[in-house]
Amino acid sequence: MRYITAGESHGPQLTTIIEGVPAGLPLVADDINEELARRQKGYGRGRRMQIETDQVQIVSGVRHGETLGSPIALVVENRDFAHWTKIMGAEPLTEQEEKEMKRKVTKPRPGHADLNGAIKYGHRDMRNVLERSSARETTVRVAAGAVAKKVLAELGIAVAGHVIEIGGVQAKETTYRSIEELKSITEASPVRCLDEEAGNQMIKAIDDAKSNGDSIGGIVEVIVEGMPIGVGSYVHYDRKLDAKLAAAIMSINAFKGVEIGIGFEAAHRPGSEVHDEILWDEEHGYTRRTNNAGGLEGGMTTGMPIVVRGVMKPIPTLYKPLQSVDIDTKEPFTASIERSDSCAVPAASVVAEAVVAWELATALIEQFGLDRMDLIRENIEKHNEYARGF
C-alpha cells in the first residue's frame, strides 16, 4: 500500500489518495470520522479545533460499504478556508492586491520549517512553507491510518496509543490488563494517560505553559497486539520493519526521537537482562518470557506486542515568541505568531497510532498479500498454524 497527501492548512481541503488496499474490506465514512474526532481532542489544543469539525468524504474506491481494490480518494474540507479565500486562493493577485495582502510571513519561527523551506524553494512569503509544513496535514494521515487500522482489525490485530510523559511529568502507572482496557482508560483521559494522578499534573503543566505563552512536548507510546511471527525481513536494511516504524514515527511533525521496546534503556543493562527468553507450549507455540525487544528482533516481528515510543518537542509557535530576523530587512525581530496549540502530545498519540498501523498493514499485505481480504486472512491463518508447530 502507499498514499500521498495534498493540501494546505488554510486551503480549501486536504486530500489523500490511497493505493493497494485489498478488495472486500468493510469501510464507511464513520470508521474514518471516529479517528479524525480523536485527533481533534486532547487537552492543550488551540482555537482552530473549535472551528474545524473534520468529516471525511470518500470520493472513490469504496462502493456500498466495501473497498473495490481500486485507489481510494479521501477529502476533508477546511472550514476555516472561508476566512482565507483571498490569501490562500489559487488565482493570481493584482499588484495592488499583493501589496494589500495580509498575513505575509517574513519573520521565521525558530524550530519550524519556515526559514529552511523558504531558502529551499525561494519563497519570500514564508506562508508558502508553513501552510504545508503545518501539522494540519496529519488530518489526512490519520484518515489513511484509519483505513490501515480497519485492515488490521479485520485480521484480529489491535492498535492503541497513550501518553506517558508531558512537560517532564511522567506516568508511573502504565500497566493494563488488555488493550481494550487501555483504550477505555485513555479515551476517558483529557491527556490520554493511563495514570490519573499523572494526568492531572500534565493538565496543570499545560495550563502553566499556556499562561506563560509557552509550549511543552512529551512522549507517546503505541502498542500493537496480534501480529504474526516473522513479518518484516532481516535480508535487506530497507525491509526491516523496525526501521520502517522508526521512520514513520519520525515523519510526524515535531517528533525528534523514537525507541522500540526498552529502547535506550538497553544501553544501561547487561545482555542477560535485555534479551527475551524463548518459550514454547502446544496451545500458543513460541512466546517470550519478557518483551524488552518490543515485539521486534532482526527487523521482524516476534509475535509479542509491538511497543513503539516517540518524543515530541514543544510546538515552535510561541505566544511569547523567540528572537528571529525579518528576511526582507534583515533586522532583528521576534518571530511571527500563528494560531497554535500549547501542547499537542495527546493528539499526536492518535497520529502515531495511524502511522504505525499504516506500516504494519502494508507489511502484512506485502508478505501475505493478495488483492482480496478473505484470501489474506486465510494466508495469515495458515502461517500462524505453521509457526505454532514449527
From Swiss-Prot:
Keywords: Amino-acid biosynthesis, Aromatic amino acid biosynthesis, FAD, Flavoprotein, FMN, Lyase, NADP. Its cofactor is FMNH2. InterPro entries: Chorismate_synth, Chorismate_synth_AroC_sf, Chorismate_synthase_CS. Residues 95-117 are annotated as: Disordered. It catalyses: 5-O-(1-carboxyvinyl)-3-phosphoshikimate = chorismate + phosphate. GO terms for biological process: amino acid biosynthetic process; aromatic amino acid family biosynthetic process; chorismate biosynthetic process. NADP(+) binds at R39, R45. The keyword Flavoprotein applies. GO terms for molecular function: chorismate synthase activity; FMN binding. Pathway: Metabolic intermediate biosynthesis; chorismate biosynthesis; chorismate from D-erythrose 4-phosphate and phosphoenolpyruvate: step 7/7. Coiled coil: none annotated. CDD domains: Chorismate_synthase. Its EC number is 4.2.3.5. FMN binds at R132, S133, S134, N253, A254, G298, K313, P314, I315, P316, T317, R339. One of its GO terms (cellular component) is cytosol. Reduced FMN (FMNH(2)). Homotetramer. This reaction introduces a second double bond into the aromatic ring system. Belongs to the chorismate synthase family. This is Chorismate synthase 1. It comes from Bacillus cereus (strain ZK / E33L). The gene is aroC1.
